[in-house]
Amino acid sequence: MAPAPTPAAAAGRRVAVLAAALVAASLAASVGVANAAVSYDRRSLVINGRRRILLSGSIHYPRSTPEMWPGLIQKAKDGGLDVIQTYVFWNGHEPVQGQYYFSDRYDLVRFVKLVKQAGLYVHLRIGPYVCAEWNFGGFPVWLKYVPGVSFRTDNGPFKAEMQKFVEKIVSMMKSEGLFEWQGGPIIMSQVENEFGPMESVGGSGAKPYANWAAKMAVRTNTGVPWVMCKQDDAPDPVINTCNGFYCDYFSPNKNYKPSMWTEAWTGWFTSFGGGVPHRPVEDLAFAVARFIQKGGSFVNYYMYHGGTNFGRTAGGPFIATSYDYDAPIDEFGLLRQPKWGHLRDLHRAIKQAEPVLVSADPTIESIGSYEKAYVFKAKNGACAAFLSNYHMNTAVKVRFNGQQYNLPAWSISILPDCKTAVFNTATVKEPTLMPKMNPVVRFAWQSYSEDTNSLSDSAFTKDGLVEQLSMTWDKSDYLWYTTYVNIGTNDLRSGQSPQLTVYSAGHSMQVFVNGKSYGSVYGGYDNPKLTYNGRVKMWQGSNKISILSSAVGLPNVGNHFENWNVGVLGPVTLSSLNGGTKDLSHQKWTYQVGLKGETLGLHTVTGSSAVEWGGPGGYQPLTWHKAFFNAPAGNDPVALDMGSMGKGQLWVNGHHVGRYWSYKASGGCGGCSYAGTYHEDKCRSNCGDLSQRWYHVPRSWLKPGGNLLVVLEEYGGDLAGVSLATRTT
């Protein structure tokens, strides 16, 4: 039983109640309706007058196809979720300044309406910064070149563009009647994203920017609460929320705000060159139960379905095309068991206790050295309890309310009536299902080689080296750097080939001299910068040096995005010459954005028919390959096995599957116990093997016959090893 409150504590509670009332009034005013359909108090969100424990899952609409959305949403509902959470992806919706796109995978309105049809709510994270391992953190690249712009700080040009986009999204949602008070599913919005950690390094403009963002958002009058995640100083009425593997330590910045977990990480992302992360469901369920037993009322699984970084949407750099995230619904839309089923059972147990959980604060009883009981008691006599064992190795028997209960190590049992343990986080009853890839199609190939020794009419010349993104504006991963060097009679007298050294900000680079390939180098997720050092054969007279710089996704984390660079920044030197070392950095360079095949549209049916294709190109670098195939029978998800190839990009019927790369994972993959604190380097697989081998091709992109597969291979690979497979469990 809780002790009687002291007079000081009672006074403090009266102050808290008064403050909560003032915030509720402020919230009602800010949402622009007389009686807000969605509000909050210290225990939870309040929807139409009812406190709710809400279980949510992230499904990002551009990471799957519209044809997949209904099935994914239904599986989320069947798994016991109340809410679907998604970011809004600015660079997908405004790829060119002032030109908007809301079709196909970016049909946000259609996605939100499908959630409504399924009877679920929506948490709309407008941002518009998203991070999300998404290219440039969701910012459109054109924003980098707005005069005077400085990202995520108290900067006029940046704030003007950000406000314009936020207001556009809010206006669109209102016009479609999609906020809850309009009869729609949106119960909550988010502005900015994980900015709190940036404030300490963001300078004097950081805190004013965060306050401006909150006030700007509230002024849009969405009619629902706004949140800011990882923002401890979020001003009223905005709710600050938690992201992480665990959030039971978290408390909101005011005692009249609810405790909300906007990102409960179900796993982690995969990077090219990194192992594949897995999070045991026993630990994930333990983390969620810990949060709920401490008084948490909103949990969102990030991700519930991760999906695919189609096209060039992956960020990082070096984020893989798969965004599976070890989520309860896998990249292909299939249930990951036992994770999905075990969490479903957890949700059922929590929902049984919901009326008590939202009506009382827990009291804590010690029932052992590492064991505690969190007990919720309602005024009507209802009772719910969470029995916790924090020991990582030892199962125990505990007594509670006169009964004995078995608690496995690192686990929590839920008793919705304070008597019957209906669920234990470490007791998994759902069988494990192992997915299988079933090869069904091999290909007959034709090839077309890029001309590495010619320049198009679009090429242009500048003095010195130029940063890549300022030239490409991310319209292509590729930028050619070409220069000429004159070798005199005496330069080669030693008989030794000159040594070319090229320093680059990243991310991958190939070197050609007089049309001949001299290899490639690349960085990695932890350090994208790279240096090429190689002997190159040259002759007396003029020699052509061509460097193909390739981006592998733009960074997605940080604040001053305007300062980030890609490409060859130099110096570029030629040494081992009798005349000494030549610094080529400041001479004239000719630049060409993209590859010839991109300009010709070789990835499309029309473009691929406009050139003469030859026989299979084998291990030749910078070669396009195409093949036609029939769709596999049935409805099982489909994937391409690219493990025999090098690095490049894929298209099917003109749809951009994404980047592929047979980059082997470094590091160690040790044992994996569910017990003990989880982190992203724990429980990894594929060390010493490919980070990603299989690439998802959505069924809706296929027709029964005559499907066109186009592969752009940068390094060279074995075409005979490429196959199409179906995925089953």
Swiss-Prot record:
Its main location: secreted. It comes from Oryza sativa subsp. indica. This is Beta-galactosidase 4. Residues 1-35 form the signal peptide. Keywords: Apoplast, Glycosidase, Hydrolase, Secreted, Signal. It is an enzyme of class 3 (hydrolase). One of its GO terms (biological process) is carbohydrate metabolic process. One of its GO terms (molecular function) is beta-galactosidase activity. The active site is at 194 (proton donor), 263 (nucleophile). InterPro entries: BetaGal_gal-bd (IPR048913), Galactose-bd-like_sf (IPR008979), GHD (IPR041392), Gly_Hdrlase_35_cat (IPR031330), Glyco_hydro_35_CS (IPR019801), Glycoside_Hdrlase_35 (IPR001944), Glycoside_hydrolase_SF (IPR017853). SUPFAM superfamilies: (Trans)glycosidases, Galactose-binding domain-like. It holds the Pfam family BetaGal_gal-bd. It comes from the Eukaryota. Belongs to the glycosyl hydrolase 35 family. It catalyses: Hydrolysis of terminal non-reducing beta-D-galactose residues in beta-D-galactosides. GO terms for cellular component: apoplast. It is found in: Secreted, Extracellular space, Apoplast. Its EC number is 3.2.1.23.
